[in-house]
């Protein structure tokens, strides 16, 4: 049996296409930022390769889709799985449970700007700040 016909359930995670903020390195969580034209093209290109009968994402075999309620994620869904793909609205759940983490006070700032802010507060003298080890002031 080919992998495409396997009975094992699959979970696929798709990130939204490029936004102006992701393009410029700005931290984005709760702010509504639309896809750029390039971001929309990224998703459309991925859809052409990944979505369709016999492809990795076969709309007839999709059991459920979970989507962040951010506009960029909704637009990505619409480009990846358009209404013509026959996925019923009942199979789509918009949920805050899969939103990007909260950047708090660092929302909209670049890593360089965040490091400067933290330096001004006298923080990170031992090692340079990273979002992974030090988190976000006022966020996660």
Where do the PLM segments sit?
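Active-site-proximal alpha-helix that buttresses catalytic centers in soluble enzyme cores
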Residues: 3-87
């Amino acid at each position: 049996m080919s992998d495409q016909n396997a009975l094992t359930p699959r979970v696929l995670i798709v990130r939204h296409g490029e936004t102006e903020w992701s393009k410029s390195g700005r931290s984005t969580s709760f702010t509504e930022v639309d896809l750029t034209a390039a971001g929309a093209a990224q998703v459309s290109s991925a859809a052409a390769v990944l979505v369709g009968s016999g492809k990795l994402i076969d709309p007839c075999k999709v059991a459920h889709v979970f989507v962040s309620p951010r506009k960029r994620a909704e637009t990505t869904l619409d480009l990846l799985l358009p209404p013509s793909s026959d996925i019923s609205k009942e199979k789509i759940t918009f949920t805050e449970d899969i939103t990007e983490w909260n950047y708090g006070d660092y929302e909209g700032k670049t890593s360089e700007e965040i490091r400067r802010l933290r330096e001004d507060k006298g923080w990170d003298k031992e090692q340079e700040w990273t979002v992974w080890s030090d988190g976000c002031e006022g966020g996660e």
